Amino acid sequence: MAKFVIAGKANCPYYAKAELLADYLQKNLPDFRIFKITQHPDKWEDWVEDVCERNMWDHRTSPIIWRELLDRGGRGLLLGGYNEFLEHAQLYYGVTSNMTTELMMVIAKENMQTHTEQQLDKETMKDLISPLQVWIASAGTYVCCHLIPLLLSGEVFGMHTEISLTLFDQEQREDCLRSIVMETQDLASPVLRTVSFCTTVKEAFLQAQVIIILDDSTEEEVYSLESCLRSRVPLCRLYGYLIEKNAHKSVKVIVGGKNFVNLKTTLLMQYAPNIASNIIAVALGVEGQAKAVLARKMKTTSANIKDVIIWGNITGNNYVDLRKAKVYNYESAVKGPPGHYHSVLSLIFDREWITKEFVQTLKILSSTGKQFGGILAAHSIATTLKYWYHGSPPGEIVSLGVMSEGQFDIPEGIVFSMPVKFENGTWVVLTDLEDISLSEKTLSRLTGDLIQEKLVACGDLLTFQPIEEDPKDNEPSNTGMNEEKEQPGSDDSDEKNEDQ
């Protein structure tokens, strides 16, 4: 059987003439088969050079015709161009072509139009079936190992969304990345299309639609505070440049971890201004810690506690606000209907525990990073992404680090954790909540550290000076007690029913 491949520029008249002759031979000869390849004129030279280099041929003009010896795509024997094919047809089959130049030009024009339409159709189909491009930066950290199964569970992006996962880290972490890739493949997740790793900086975040920034895997703990702050700038500058250059224009960037999360988010926004509105910082980890401490005190589960608000620096000086906090399914003498809840502050009668032990426990957890391990960090990131794509539970308050635009009298230009809700693929700051205004002292304390972090990191301030707290003024404010218009133990806040 004679198997020929005819390739040429889509607008080449000689390709059109060779194609028509080959069609005639295939129609009339039982053992004559052809395969056609058209290339856009702009891509022809690179394509034919690659084919000739691969097969050790010497041919540059259009068309190029070769005979395949065995199977389609297998080893081939170069025949030549149009003239060689015409001579071959005359000698072997006694057939020639009498196509006029005018007809050749008409068919070449039609071929070009058809090629263009087919390419557009291919691009459209590719967009319909292309997987979601997810990148994880600093993927050599242990958090990544806990995060990957959550991303591939189908709960974050949906069971019908396929994922192409790329792990990015420094070159010295290549062995670790290779191991994680193999383990990820072993999961055999139905939503995983491909998984790979990248250690080449210039290729980072290529066509990324979701980027997860974790703590740097090579961070040192021997720096001074000022050195730590300044060391974040080069990496964030690099990431910002790469995201702007390589990522999809609607990329979603989520920053998680336990070290300077607000600062890193601020710097990324500064160095990637075109996608700044799509960069957020994860605060659900701190929120989860606060809920767990409350749950242990109230002898319930942390999942029953809702609407704890985290203000300020997610991984530093923050304010845990319980004024809107609720507990559902609480074991008490009176049981309400589904959706019934109690105010958390109305059920904790030990005010000294709230103002001292609770505050101190959270402060220790925040300052040391203890108990903020891989499981909690991964779950917080995955849950925030799920809310971003599918919306947060109706009526529920979520804490999120976003760029301040002056809401709640917070200075502009800093990333600040505040109450939000997710809906329709974005988030909305809940500025319409009642009785959650912050006192001037509390606001000054929370914003002061964030502003100093940014100034020190950018070299505008040499020394970081933590703002000293006044225990009498600020201990109660950590739970929001001194911010309420009504005392938490009042009858009005004891029991409520939430609209379903």
UniProtKB/Swiss-Prot annotation:
Its EC number is 1.1.1.-. One of its GO terms (biological process) is malate metabolic process. The keyword Transmembrane helix does not apply. GO terms for molecular function: malate dehydrogenase activity; oxidoreductase activity, acting on the CH-OH group of donors, NAD or NADP as acceptor. Keywords: NAD, Oxidoreductase, Tricarboxylic acid cycle. Residues 489-500 have a biased composition (Acidic residues). The keyword Oxidoreductase applies. It comes from the Eukaryota. Residues 465-500 are annotated as: Disordered. Belongs to the LDH/MDH superfamily. MDH type 2 family. This is Putative malate dehydrogenase 1B.
